[in-house]
Design a protein with these regions (language model features):
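Catalytic-site microenvironment of enzymes
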Residues: 1-153
Length: 153
């Protein structure tokens, strides 16, 4: 990967893909292929991370798979190898989300001294089919003014 710009120098991003490990998210089927939400969210997260790094940002990839990188296949095979920075991912949703927040908070406590801008980006794919059968896309931005940590409430 080649850095093409320093536009994001001094920025640090925590990129988190949805589901993973024991939770594949929703599973769809196209012909003989199963489509698992977590595999596509992970692939998109890696592509985003690469693009941020090319612009000079530091990127921490929170959900990781030791074997799968960016894949150019139309259909991505499922695995349950994903970890949360080396730790097994719990099946329980609240525990899974808290684990991710804990990892980000620990990294942020170290990184905030070295970077002028730190943000977490969560990638989640919702494959629920609706009546109009169109894909929806949402961006949720959380602004923290006084809280020291991200929290699950």
């Amino acid at each position: 990967m080649k850095v093409t710009s320093n536009r994001l120098a001094g920025a640090c991003f925590y990129v988190v893909s949805g589901h993973g490990g024991p939770d594949p998210g929703a599973i769809g089927k196209v012909g003989k292929y199963e489509l698992h939400e977590d595999e596509y969210a992970y692939d998109i997260a890696l592509r985003l991370a690469r693009n941020l790094m090319q612009e000079g940002a530091e990127v921490r990839i929170i959900i990781q798979d030791a074997k799968d990188g960016i894949r150019d296949d139309s259909y991505l095979s499922n695995s349950k190898r994903e970890t949360c920075m080396g730790d097994p991912i719990p099946l329980n949703q609240v525990q899974r989300l808290q684990q991710r927040c804990d990892k980000i908070n620990a990294l942020y406590r170290k990184d905030r001294k070295n970077y002028s801008y730190c943000r977490a980006i969560f990638i989640h794919i919702d494959s629920v089919v609706r009546e109009n059968k169109r894909m929806s896309f949402s961006i949720i931005r959380i602004k923290r003014e006084k809280a020291n940590d991200w929290q699950i409430i």
